[in-house]
Amino acid sequence: NEIKSFLPVQSIIKKFLIIFLVFIFIPNKLSSMSHIVDDKGIIVLMYHRFEENKYPSTNIKIADFVKQIDLIKKYNFNFINAKDFKSNLVNLKSNKKILLTIDDAFKSFYEQAWPLLKNEKIPFILFVNTREIGSNGYMTWEQIREISKEKFVHIGNHSYSHDYLVDKQDDEIIKDIDLARRDLKKNLGYNSSFFSYPFGEYSINFKNIIKNF
């Protein structure tokens, strides 16, 4: 299985960098990246679960993930970290840059993909919806702290509840995001300037709340 499509991102919104992307990984030929090697922008790849076959819409087999990483290397793309992503949005110097993001902090990421990323020091952002941390199927705070100690890793805000926040009132949205922010500060010692919308869904109002948070 190879990577079929990528979506470039070049938008920056004040205090929070908003990542609300949906990426599709579909079987294709190895040459499937050749049509984007000259594209301008930063490619962001989003993953969720690894080797959790009962969740096909958000799952990827670890063997396919390894193939995708190898494919990225084959075409000489550069993996960038959160800091470089932010600076490159302000001053786009070149193409062929890729940022990996992982949503939800599922336990399967820690068990399946983390060893590979750690061994190869591939940078990524792990977006955490903090209410679920430590519950069944999710990572623990201890595991997240372990990961966050690596310089190539950044832990981002993915809300507290992972609810459909676009349906909530302003005060509910603010409370939810603030709870996640407080959890991150308490457990990791910092507040992230990166936010990933739950389900990739947002509204103008929601975006403005994040913008001014």
Which residues does each PLM region occupy?
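Positively charged n-region of N-terminal signal peptides that target proteins for export
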Residues: S11-K15
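Bacterial N-terminal signal peptides
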Residues: I18-I24
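N-terminal pre-catalytic segment of deacetylase/amide-hydrolase enzymes
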Residues: I26-I98
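Metal-dependent polysaccharide deacetylase catalytic core of the NodB/CE4 family, i.e.
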Residues: K40-Y55, N95-I98, K107-N205
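Noncatalytic alpha-helical scaffolds and linker/capping helices
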Residues: D103-A105
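Short, intrinsically disordered, charge-balanced linker/junction segments flanking boundaries
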Residues: K207-F213
